[in-house]
Amino acid sequence: MTQIAHPDSILIIDFGSQVTQLIARRIREAGVYCEIHPFQNAAEAFEKLQPKGVIFSGGPASVTAEGSPRAPQAVFDSKVPILGICYGQQTLCTQLGGVVEGGHAAEFGRADIDIKKASPLFEGFWEQGKSYPVWMSHGDRVTKLPEGFEVIATSENAPFAIAADEKRHYYTTMFHPEVVHTPDGGKLLSNFVHKIVGLKSDWTMAAYRAEMIRKIREQVGTGRVLCALSGGVDSSVAAILIHEAIGDQLTCVYVDHGLMRLGESEQVVGMFRDHYNIPLVHVDAADLFLGELSGVSDPEVKRKTIGRLFIEVFEAEAAKIAADGKGAPKFLAQGTLYPDVIESVSFSGGPSVTIKSHHNVGGLPERMNMQLVEPLRELFKDEVRALGRELGLPESFIGRHPFPGPGLAIRCPGAITREKLDILRKADAIYLDEIRKAGLYDTIWQAFAVLLPVQTVGVMGDYRTYDFVCALRAVTSVDGMTADFYPYDMNFLGRAATRIINEVRGINRVVYDVTSKPPGTIEWE
């Protein structure tokens, strides 16, 4: 496992808040390394990480309930600065002798706090005697502060909206500074890590690149590494970073399942072979995948079929590479990101409903008995893009919209055929071309065309047509967890629809999807 030591870091103890990852994002944006660990293993994480400061997250539990989560005593014994947020405020105060009660007026949504006393927590942007908007989400509240604490700010239903023991560097907020609805929340978190904890902004992708190259060389030695290349940003950045570290000890395998966008496979193969000179095995498996998918209309069966075939094809190619006389690869590279790591050790540890199966190479390590090389496992998606820029990847590649592993198979509801895929590729290319011409590509999180399993009557010239319906989808989002449809003007939609109908044989009607997530998902399948 490829990991870096971080002497100057922040530990975030997760008590189950749905927005804990946003705390980490804000801290990273401030140039400071941090890790999230669930409260169940926080003591072990604290001892291992040796952080310079700790943040207690919010959470759904009530501090007044028997057996509700607590922070490890070792954190208090260490005397490092602490910031408690919402539930984090309540458990910190409870554990230090304060009182928390339920049944008072709750606050959910926007609230205004009144600053009663100056504090380094908001030095430079909030002033004593003034009010500022924040985002609250609490039912319980602190009714008695621990010894040594004083009120810094209040709100209508939170007498201790901010409370602190500045001598011990303990700070608490009843509101959530990590969410965008608290306009100055990012500055507050930055002040905590810089002015209170005293850390510098030394978490950069340049430093990460140099240290990760050293760690990869240390882990791999003279061994060979295989990388399953999808053509997406994550696996591409991982491959280029590993190649920079160990050169031709890396071999990439690109399995072309025949479900990519127009010209995409050629672009990926050309970039890796010609521009980066990375050893690449290009497997044209379109006939295999499309043959197995013939007549399959259930989206879950599609996803699982694609995942199974990918593993089978990759294993076969790995066996060929192992027999080339240069030694069998002992390492498997994956583009695992930090959110994947967090979710694998979730706060609750309980089951969750599977909305859609995720197509990835998760089944490969156990089956192939290989050690993992995961150079991105400490990074969020935006940091991966920043690392890609640091490595010199073109912006046109780094800024590409997300594309699902099963490819166009899930943008073609119902049974797929080569003819349908060709129609969809052309429509999708025209749609994205119009988006780029309008200067909207970087504004939109994700945009794509969907070919519906529905045919409608149309008229072209003097002839009746009976062709497919194409749906256009475009959403704005921060992280893909929630999304809103993009509000195009009608002139744009008219241009895109006209081009698609005129230039793509097989489509005679175009519609626009105005569903947000939730209740819908971004992809149609």
UniProtKB/Swiss-Prot annotation:
Name of encoding gene: guaA
InterPro entries, per database record: Class_I_gatase-like, GATASE, GMP_synth_C, GMP_synth_GATase, GMP_synthase, GMPS_ATP_PPase_dom, Rossmann-like_a/b/a_fold
Catalyzed reaction equations: XMP + L-glutamine + ATP + H2O = GMP + L-glutamate + AMP + diphosphate + 2 H(+)
Protein name: GMP synthase [glutamine-hydrolyzing]
GO terms of molecular function: ATP binding; GMP synthase activity
Domain of life: Bacteria
Coiled-coil residue spans: none
HAMAP family: GMP_synthase
